[in-house]
Amino acid sequence: MKYVFFVCSIFSVIVVFSICIFIFIYSLPIFKETGFLKFVFGMNWSPSSKHFGIFPMIVGSVYITILSTLLGGGFGFFTAVYISMFAPNKLKVILSQVIDLLAGIPSIVYGFFGMSVLVPFLKNISPNDIGEGVLASSIILAVMILPTITSITKYNLEAVYKYYYDGARALGNTHSQAVFGVIVKAAKSGIFSAIVLGMGRAIGETMAVMMVAGNAPFIPQDLFSYFRTMTINIALEMGYATGIHRSALIGTAFVLLLFILIINIILSLLKRNNLYFSFSFTSLFKKNKELKTDINNFSFKNYEMKMQTIKGDMLKYISIFATAVSTLFLVFIVVFILVRGLPHITLNLLFGKSNNSQMTLLPAIVSTSMMLFMSLIIAIPLGVFAAIYLTEYSKAKSKLIALIRIFTDSLSGIPSIVFGLFGMLVFANLLGIGRSILAGSLTLVLIILPSIIRQTEETLMSIPASLREGSLALGASKVRTIFQIVLPCGFSGIMTSVILSIGRIVGESAALIYTAGAVRYMPKGYLSSGSSFSVMMWMFSSEGLYINQTFATASILLIMIIVLNALLFFVNKKLKKDY
């Protein structure tokens, strides 16, 4: 069994290499014809004229990534500080649940909200009567990455050793001074990691931005300019592209992979540093060294100390304001979608026959269920077995284990649209499966596998070694110990990874359009094309005639996410074991 576990553990390495190799090979025709530098720095994208320059798309991607990270990162950081350091316990639980809920909302829902509410609002204040563009996309992306940044930052703040805080308070700091002067500084590596992860999601987002960007392949001139990102370029044109045009789109994905690689390298460098920076608490008072040593000079009558107190209080109130704005805005999105969508959920929409005259959700229900079953039945054993090898058979400081973990993290950072391209090239075309539910399911396996591995690995690592040693001392084999002691103890963590995977599958759209398909008809089997819930919602909104159905589908997606989060809360509260 050890070798089975090992093969499963290196699967992520094989997949990452395969994605890079296939994307590069299919990109070679455009690189040979135009040259890599001309392709990257070319200013004109006009497939009909055989001009393929993606620099405007690169600028657009970087532009909104920076803006959304500044906006979402700032609000996310201060929200995390308030929740972890200032909020009362009951409010902390509520806010944490709200943030976790909103982190699971599909991107297509955010995009539709932006198209329905944000774009009309910005159009009224725009100097050129345009609502779509850089500002709308940046706001939507900021809202999308805010829950991720908040959750990770909150975790890192709460992980700081308590004696750092106690030492700061003992030196005369207020609570606010201790938080912003000590705790935040000690956790800054983890905070930067959260922001970098947010950047990775922002630069790889497709569907939400496509609905509010305007999608013109030009360098944006101002906040209300139409623009196009690399991911949007792929999603818009891959459906009809052939020949060198198709190679140019795949080349765009290759350049996008290079950006993701750079972000992952930065993230790895941050993770190599110790989360907690060693520093002297007395450094907080280095400006006071010039003061007299008399104890009275450290009182709050001293002007400089008063300013430090005011600064700490100001940052505290900024945290309260950021939390209120973030939470209210995110809750408003959910309430708005539910209020507009729930009245339009009918039996005919759910279970009516979908044909040329009407579109219903029945094909999406069947297709999504089929993809859920197939992808989970493949990904769960792969992920759990990989985690078993990483925790039960790995050696301390093993370079191979470190390499596997790096590639697993890299796999989790690859944008959905790139997974979709890989699935189309390999599963649909190379293996001859075609656009089908099976091709979509296999693509989803690659998407959800990293989260299953890491969640299960973290759970298994938290199980005390004494339980394993006791089983082995009683004569049980290592494999029997794993299956009868370790895995049952880690059941809650495995269930958590499964629930999170279900949420990811239900909300996925970009990776499925060119693998599973985008059709309105009932699938006849796994080799038939089928549309997931999110893809069907995208089809509803694209038609322009099914606005009520789009709101209804968005409401159903939100209800699913709420139910999944409730299950997640139950699993963590009732099934998780404390050792």
Regions flagged by a language model, labelled:
Residues 3, 25-68, 88, 236-246, ...:
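Periplasmic/extracellular loop-to-transmembrane helix junction in inner-membrane transport proteins
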Residues 124, 209-257, 357, 512-558:
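Interhelical loop and adjacent transmembrane-helix boundary motif
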Residues 67-99, 263, 267-276, 375-408, ...:
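Transmembrane-helix boundary motif in ABC transporter permease subunits
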Residues 152-153, 175-211, 455-456, 464, ...:
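Transmembrane alpha-helices
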Residues 100-141, 409-444:
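Generic hydrophobic transmembrane alpha-helix motif, especially the helices
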Residues 59, 63-71, 75, 79, ...:
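Hydrophobic alpha-helical transmembrane segments of multipass integral membrane proteins
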Residues 106, 171-172, 415, 474-475, ...:
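Glycine/proline-centered hinge or cleavage motifs at structural transition points of membrane proteins
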Residues 154-162, 169, 196, 236-296, ...:
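C-terminal transmembrane helix and the adjacent membrane-cytosol boundary/short C-terminal tail
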